[in-house]
Amino acid sequence: MKNRCLYCYEPLSEGERVDYHAKCCRKLFGTSQAPILPYTSSEVRALADEVVRSQTTVTGVQPKLSLDFDQMSNSPKRFTIVGLWGRFILKPQTERYPHLPELEDVSMHLAEIAKIETVPHGLMRFSDGELCYITRRIDRTGQGEKLPMEDMCQLSERLT
């Protein structure tokens, strides 16, 4: 998606070297500038596979990692991979299902058009340019306490 915002899909201004409009950044990340994702897609895929094997993953069937802002970096903010308690969930590309992050993001956009409430979500680039899906977690309070919520796996009576 060249020259389009990875949050709203609308065109970016001519010559802009960013992936989001400032207002879209605030909606997704809570900042006017997108945080840096300092990992390559292959590094994250290897980490996600390791996390799935160790069974310390966010529930669901896709490989995913929990992210939060690196408290040591100020401007621009940087993401770091954390345990289960991060404020964001990142879903990388998978070999089995090409373009799954893009499909999930466009599905969420279609849900919004149908007036279905969704979590803040968008696409993001790894340091090598490959796209991944990112969403802000809404199943935790600001203090990290779990909020009761159902996801599609639970609705389909699939164990996660």
Where do the PLM segments sit?
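Regulatory N- and C-terminal appendages and interdomain linkers associated
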Residues: 1-42
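Conserved ATP-binding subdomain of kinase catalytic cores across diverse folds
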Residues: 43-159
